[in-house]
C-alpha cells in the first residue's frame, strides 16, 4: 500500500473534498469493480468500448488484480485505476490499461504514480515487459518507448506511434513479436 501526501501546490487544486491524503494505492479487489467502472465511464465515456485496446482485453477476459492498482481517497472511494492483463506475443508479457483518474483528482501525478506502482508489481512478478497504447509524451518519463515498426500487432487499428513498451527483464523482449493476444 502506498499513500500519497496531500501537500504541495498540485494537491491544493484538488479541493478539500478529497480529504487529507491524495490517495492510497492498493491492489484491485472485487469490491472495487462497480466504482472502477464509474471512473472509467467518467474518463472515457461509452467510446472506450470501441478502442482496439478493448479488443485485447476482451480476449483475455480478466485483469490481474494483484498487479493492477486502484487509488482510494480518504473516504475509501475509488478515484483512479491502472489495470494489468497477462497477454502473449511470442512470449508472455503484460498489457497495461485502462488507466483512468477521476477528473477531480487529475493533474496531481496520480496517473503516473498508478502506472509506476503497477509496473513495479509486474517487475516483481518476473514479467518480461509491459505493452500499452498511449501517449509517448505521458509514458516516456516512466521508461516506455515506441515499439519498433512491425514488431507487434493488435487485433484492430492502432497508431504505431502510440504502441509503447517497457522491458522489465534483461532481453525481456528478445522473443516478443507478433499479435498481442491471450496467454
Where would I find each of the regions flagged by the language model?
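A conserved beta-turn-beta hairpin within the catalytic core of GNAT-like acetyltransferases
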Residues: 87-96, 106
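Conserved acetyl-CoA-binding loop-helix of GNAT-fold acetyltransferases
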Residues: 101, 107-120, 131-132
Amino acid at each position: 500500500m502506498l499513500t500519497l501526501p496531500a501537500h504541495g501546490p498540485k494537491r491544493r487544486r484538488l479541493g478539500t473534498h478529497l480529504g487529507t491524503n491524495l490517495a492510497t494505492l492498493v491492489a484491485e479487489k472485487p469490491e472495487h469493480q462497480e466504482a472502477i467502472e464509474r471512473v472509467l465511464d467518467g474518463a472515457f465515456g461509452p467510446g472506450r468500448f470501441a478502442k482496439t485496446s478493448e479488443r485485447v482485453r476482451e480476449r483475455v477476459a480478466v485483469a490481474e488484480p494483484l498487479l493492477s492498482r486502484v487509488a482510494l481517497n480518504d473516504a475509501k472511494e475509488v478515484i483512479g485505476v491502472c489495470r494489468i492483463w497477462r497477454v502473449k506475443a511470442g512470449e508472455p508479457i503484460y498489457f497495461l490499461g485502462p488507466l483512468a483518474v477521476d477528473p477531480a483528482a487529475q493533474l496531481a501525478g496520480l496517473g503516473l504514480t498508478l502506472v509506476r506502482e503497477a509496473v513495479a508489481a509486474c517487475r516483481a512478478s518476473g514479467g518480461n515487459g509491459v505493452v500499452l497504447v498511449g501517449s509517448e509524451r505521458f509514458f516516456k518519463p516512466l521508461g516506455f518507448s515506441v515499439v519498433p515498426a512491425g514488431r507487434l500487432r493488435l487485433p484492430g487499428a492502432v497508431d504505431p506511434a502510440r504502441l509503447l513498451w517497457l522491458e522489465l527483464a534483461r532481453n525481456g523482449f528478445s522473443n516478443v513479436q507478433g499479435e498481442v493476444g491471450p496467454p
